[in-house]
Every structure is written in C-alpha cells, then in structure tokens.
Amino acid sequence: QRVFEALRTFDNSPVTEIYTQCPDGRGLGLAVGNRLKKAAGFHGVEADSEKIILGLTGGTGAGKSSALAVLRKLGAVVLDCDQVYHQMLAEDEEMQKEGSRAFPGVFRPDGTLDRRKLGQEVFMKKEQLEKLNAIVYRFLVPEIQRQLAAAENGVCAIDAVNLLESGLDEDCDRTVAITSPTELRVRRIMARDQITEHYALMRITAQKPDEYYRGKCSCELNNDADTAEEFQKTAERFFKRLIRSVREEKQNRKI
C-alpha cells in the first residue's frame, strides 16, 4: 500500500521514469509485484545484476566528452582509452621499447613522449599511422579488457576514437556513434582549442567521416544541439532508454 501511495504523488508530475524495488516474489510480495507490472505498467529488470558495456566513438568535436559526462552522471564507469594509452606510455617499459624501435627519437632522454614529434611522424601518413596503431592496440586492448573485467556490475563505457578498428567493439553490448554536422564541429573545435577554421577542418578531414561510424555502430546519437546543455538533455534520455533496453534484453535471455 505504501508503494502505491508513493506512486500516486507522481500522478501530476512531469517525471518520465520511476524505479522501485520489487518485493520478494512469494506470497503477498508476488501479488504486489504482479500489480506493479500489470496495473502500474512497470517493467521488471534486475538493476545492476550484470555488467552493461557501451562503446562510444566518433570524430573530434562531435560531443563524446559531453555524452560521457552524462554517462558518469548516470553512474557509469568510464574507461578513457586515450588516458589509459598515455598512462601506459609513461609506465609500460615494453610499450616504450616497442615505440622507440618503430619511431626513433619520439621519446625524450627522461623517457617522456614527445607528442608533437610523434604527431609529425604519423599525421597524414597512412602507413606510419597504421604502424603506430598496431603497437597501441597490442598493448592497450588487453589492458582495457582487464579493467572491464575488474569493474563492478553496472554500466561501463569505453571512450575510444578507434573503438571499431581496435576490435574493442566486440566487447560491447552496444556501440554508439556520436555524430554531428561539420559546421558545428568546426565551431566547437575552434572554441575548445583556440585554432583557426582551417586547422579545425584539417583535423576533421584527417579522421573518418560520420558515415563510417554510422554504418558500423549499433546505434547513433546525433549532436546537432547549439549548446552542451541542450545536447546533454538529449543524451540523458537516449542513454536511459538504451541502458533499459540492454538490461531487459539480458533479463529475457535468462527466462
């Protein structure tokens, strides 16, 4: 009775989603649970009983950072592949040796990476970039998989520009392409990095187009919003629906 009294307080509220703990599935608890599902239209899911892995990818300026901020707000563990990669470059001696052999001189005498020099080695040079990526994937993918395995049940999000190329998409329940019109991406990159329109466009054209991500990912989140706040509201609705869908799918497999 207390559960239904509490639910009635939301009758005239704009709230779109309500979560309530379902009673024990025996005796009176079974009756209340059935009423929640049938009369009140609730869907039964086991909250955080399993791990849900989402992979986010897309080009620079599309809005991945804003989307990830929403996922963090929803309680997700976010694995930033770029951050893990740079941490490994600083700490993993085997990875450093492999990088030094392939790209002599990109590491300074103190062992730190000269990112500008490495960038010059691979920017707009397909063969060099492929060589670098092969090294990165060999070390990075097992580390991301290790961190995923160590994470508690719930939602995990992988943030990776090369999610598809590295094969990490195979570890995901859903892959999400974050896309956005080129003119908006240019504006965001110019404001974020304090660079000219010419250089912003160069960065975009050096990466794969939205059509590539759209065609290979299981779903798309388009960022055509004028402000980050507007996009985050859209992203929150999108991810809530997506997470609920994956949870229900996993639950149905058990039945």
What positions do the PLM features span?
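A C-terminal functional module that forms or caps the active site or interfaces directly
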Residues: 1-41
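ATP-dependent small-molecule kinase phosphotransfer cores
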Residues: 83-153
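Hydrophobic anchor at the beta1->P-loop junction of P-loop NTPases
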Residues: 54-56
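ATP-dependent NMP and nucleoside kinases share a basic, alpha-helical "lid"
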Residues: 142-150, 155-192
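P-loop (Walker A) phosphate-binding loop of NTP-binding proteins
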Residues: 59
